[in-house]
Amino acid sequence: MPYCRIDSDTEIYYMEYGSGDRYVICSQIDHEYTAFSFERELSRRGFHVFLLTDRGFGRSTHTKENYGLGWYDRFADDVIAFADAMGIDRFVYSGASHGSGVGWHLCLRDPERLICFFADVAGPISPEGIPVEGILSGNDVTAENDPNAPAFCSLPDFFYIPTDDQAIIERRRICKEADSTLRASENYKEIFESDDTMRINTGPALIGLRTEEKLREALRTIETPVLMLGGTEDVISTPELMIRTAKCLPHCKLVIHSGFGHVLDIYEELADDAVKFYENVINTGRYYTPVDNTPIEGIR
């Protein structure tokens, strides 16, 4: 299994897909519970993809340390340390949900390392009024719901909006089967639901800003080109939140898909948008297709 040592105490577990120097890095709580993903699809489109597991989770080094409101800063710093260790200078960051939270922190902390950011169901949710006591104390992130519930692997059914597309239905069946297989594996509890892991409460990304006004101010400073991807039925990263974010970002394209929620499992479609976005950024420095002012001759 591939590991990268990023400091004296921490190894990050990662999965690698594709080859070449068009690097995509994604850091999530875990990647193993699903058989498909947007980033894996990108590896079919000529990208060299690294899927990192956040410190404290899964096969990465578990920790007893509580970073309080700084978990996402820690994850972002780990991404940079990983890139340095792998000899990667600039890269695309891609992430979904909490994984996209790492991207927002990278945009604010290390923008010079980013080519662009693929932000999948990325919010970010407003920090306004979110209690921080549980985060600061390191209380179990699942405690307010069900203290015996699995922490982070299975995606809730309400994330998936019903569809009549048989290919998507089959994809979801395969993913549930992969999740069940993972749960039945040897040492599952030790690896994925250790006491140290279950105590982690990261809170949402950018919670340290504390107010909606400060969040918007921070978003307005982001110069990194951002491709935002979302669904009309998402109850977490709602369309309203994503439109708010797009209005703040100076270099952003927002694509919202009808009939999808917090899981956009049309990965081929997302990759189509991402490839075009990336090529525009690389070729022109802008997120949109170059303007062509050549006169168009009509039929006379």
Model feature map: region roles:
Residues 10-62:
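Conserved HGGG/HGGXW glycine-rich cap/lid loop of the alpha/beta-hydrolase fold
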Residues 51-94:
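Active-site loop/oxyanion-hole signature of alpha/beta-hydrolase fold enzymes
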Residues 222, 228-230:
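Short beta-strand/loop motif that positions the catalytic acidic residue
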Residues 95-99, 103:
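Gly/Ala-rich beta-loop-alpha elbow adjacent to hydrolase catalytic centers
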Residues 235-241:
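Conserved alpha/beta-hydrolase "acid-adjacent" motif
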Residues 129, 150-204, 208-209, 213, ...:
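Conserved alpha/beta-hydrolase catalytic His-Asp/Glu region
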Residues 108, 117-155:
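Flexible "cap/lid" loop of the alpha/beta hydrolase fold
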Residues 251-300:
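Catalytic active-site module of serine/aspartate enzymes centered on a nucleophile-bearing elbow/loop
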